């Protein structure tokens, strides 16, 4: 859950988000080192009186500043590709949930169960209970079992939407006529908030997403009560 004036990323709840956080730190450190080197060279050029007016060719220098950026790009690309493959890989999901975007609410269908589906609307501000979050609470939360791989099939009934839950490292476009998929897996129980992250009309800001991750036994009891 984000908090006011937060500078960093939200606390990672899934293995994917942990990898994304590590990759962010890895890339940020490379950018910091490059920026420091550039600032140092600029300050050196401004402060020194030494010039090389007679230098017409420098093969060694050109070789270094060609090979070094290539190595840096490889250091960024390899972990990035690894995470991309991890995000696309879904092996033997324990549960499949179909998510449909509408103007302006979400609908969910648990495809492994008969007649287990519902719509999820934002709770208006005047109906919120003490302690509930404005513009983030919904009337029907998505209940999922923790510590199990879950496949989300995401699409849209009308316009472009985007199903995003930052603490789980999820952001998948909901496109009419196209079925995208994402993997959901939580390391711990809790309630995790997200929002539609694609401008989809006048009420775009009123499409929150709430996932409630619970132990498997409690999820089974909930699914029986909903069927």
From Swiss-Prot:
Cofactor note: Binds a dinuclear copper A center per subunit.
Topological domain spans for side Mitochondrial matrix: 46-59
Binding site for Cu cation A1: 161, 196, 200, 207
Transmembrane segments: 15-45, 60-87
Binding, Cu cation A2: 196, 198, 200, 204
InterPro entries the UniProt entry points to: CcO_II, CcO_II-like_C, CcO_II_C, Copper_CuA, Cupredoxin, Cyt_c_oxidase_su2, Cyt_c_oxidase_su2_TM_dom, Cyt_c_oxidase_su2_TM_sf
Binding-site list for Mg(2+): 198
Keywords of this entry: Copper, Electron transport, Magnesium, Membrane, Metal-binding, Mitochondrion, Mitochondrion inner membrane, Respiratory chain, Translocase, Transmembrane, Transmembrane helix, Transport
SUPFAM superfamilies registered for this protein in UniProt: Cupredoxins, Cytochrome c oxidase subunit II-like, transmembrane region
Cited function: Component of the cytochrome c oxidase, the last enzyme in the mitochondrial electron transport chain which drives oxidative phosphorylation. The respiratory chain contains 3 multisubunit complexes succinate dehydrogenase (complex II, CII), ubiquinol-cytochrome c oxidoreductase (cytochrome b-c1 complex, complex III, CIII) and cytochrome c oxidase (complex IV, CIV), that cooperate to transfer electrons derived from NADH and succinate to molecular oxygen, creating an electrochemical gradient over the inner membrane that drives transmembrane transport and the ATP synthase.
Protein name (record): Cytochrome c oxidase subunit 2
Organism encoding this protein: Gerbilliscus robustus (Fringe-tailed gerbil)
Gene, per the UniProt record: MT-CO2
């Amino acid at each position: 859950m984000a908090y006011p004036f937060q500078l960093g990323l939200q606390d990672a709840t899934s293995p994917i988000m942990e990898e994304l956080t590590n990759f962010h730190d890895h890339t940020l450190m490379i950018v910091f080192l490059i920026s420091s080197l550039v600032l140092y060279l600029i300050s050196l050029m401004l402060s020194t009186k030494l010039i090389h007016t007679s230098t017409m060719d420098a093969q060694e220098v050109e070789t270094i500043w060609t090979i070094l950026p290539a190595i840096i790009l490889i250091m960024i690309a390899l972990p990035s590709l690894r995470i991309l493959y991890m995000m696309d890989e879904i092996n033997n999901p324990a549960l499949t949930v179909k998510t449909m975007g509408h103007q302006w609410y979400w609908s969910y269908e648990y495809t492994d169960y008969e007649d287990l589906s519902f719509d999820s609307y934002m709770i208006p501000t005047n109906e919120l209970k003490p302690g509930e979050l404005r513009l983030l609470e919904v009337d029907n939360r998505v209940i999922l079992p923790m510590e199990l791989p879950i496949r989300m099939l995401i699409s849209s009934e009308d316009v472009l939407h985007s199903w995003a839950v930052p603490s789980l490292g999820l952001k998948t476009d909901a496109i009419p006529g196209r079925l995208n998929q994402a993997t959901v897996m939580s390391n711990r129980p809790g309630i995790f908030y997200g929002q539609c992250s694609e401008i989809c009309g006048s009420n775009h800001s009123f499409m929150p997403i709430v996932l409630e991750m619970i132990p498997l036994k409690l999820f089974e009891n909930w699914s029986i009560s909903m069927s």
